[in-house]
Amino acid sequence: DDLMVMLYGMERFDVDGDPGKLKRLADHLDVDGIDGIDDSDGDRRIASVQGLKEAYGFAASRFIVEQAEHFVADHDKELLICLLCPTATEQVLRGQPRYDQGFANYLRAAGHRVFDMNEVHRQDFGDFSLSVEDYRKRYWMGHYSPAGNHFFAHSLKDTVIDWLEPKPRTYRGDAPSSADFDGYLPTPV
């Protein structure tokens, strides 16, 4: 009954789906062009399934972000959203449009603090004369390698520092002095 599992199975393993349920999902998500889901044209069917799967996934992601917004508001917290998707990274490295651009735009338009590692990789890739495959070998081994983890952490550092208040002592720009904990510890009553 899980529609995402159904869509994934249709896309990856050519299983039959339930066109009626998927049509209702498409109507709910206001997705056009899913007529090919029950079509005998394999390419059209896959394109329809992928389009609906992505729309459903991003709708679920927007819902999760909305729930996180409520949580942080209720608990006087702040939210930082980090974007890193191997598919989107591959697309930006190849100069192609990102499949998740609409979601990235949604996050920014909603005023969220967003760290987009896909764009960091795009900028970094521009500093090299490497093929996409050779660039990916620097940071990935099926998932991030230790070098990839280090690159991510180092790239995220300034975003976190800009977010923190008070800033960590080493990033305050003050002259070296003894460490203090102003702003970090509660003030005695």
Please provide the spans of the model-predicted regions.
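Serine-dependent acyl-ester chemistry module
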Residues: 1-112, 117-128, 168-189
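Short glycine/proline- and charge-enriched loop/turn segments
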Residues: 49, 129-139
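Histidine-centered active-site loop/cap adjacent to the catalytic His
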Residues: 136-175
